[in-house]
């Protein structure tokens, strides 16, 4: 066992002013530019749709807020409940999206909800995104969950990176996969690995390769850290691919690196043959506050 020598405190994360930024608006987007970056924020997406820094595209699809994980064997009894709630098909509805320049940073304010089509929202949120001239992004998010809905598989951001962004470094529980109720065989350290090596190759495809309680993550050229520890997963397979395929030999790589940065993920439990997931391991907070820096 490892012994913590001091109590872990919440970080204070700020992004510094780094030069002038400009802001443009069109019907669908806010566009932030500097000498180094061109970032596009989708007004109807509630997140960035393009990130270009030093002439290189950092993402290959819009960022999204994600609530689904490919069910593990122990999710077999709760999977239908999650699907009925619409966690497997989240849809973002943006109510307002405004932006301004203050000093040398751009600020975007977004009020949105998450629901599946034809269902009431299960999450209502307000997000503040800050961007500096070097391309660092700070997200400050406050979300309220409708407690009539079941606990959530996960809640966080998904980034779709170029396939060659496969080098991974993190400080957290490793080197094997870890979850909030499955990390006793792991230890906290700084690990370097690759996207291929993060894969836990289960015969029946499912959520795998997560790393819990991370204070720093780097995948390819992008780094991330939160004021509180986060979970992350980087894979060549989408959650949808892992959900739909019955055998590991049927899996098809997406052609991208799918990077999940999670505020939280429910534990994996033992409900395939044992009791339901214990309440302390469920992601079921009525109010969530998340601060995250990506850059």
Which functions belong to the PLM regions below?
Residues 1:
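Short, aromatic- and glycine-rich surface loops/edge beta-strands on solvent-exposed regions
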Residues 4-295:
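Beta-strand/loop-rich accessory regions of lumenal/periplasmic or secreted enzymes
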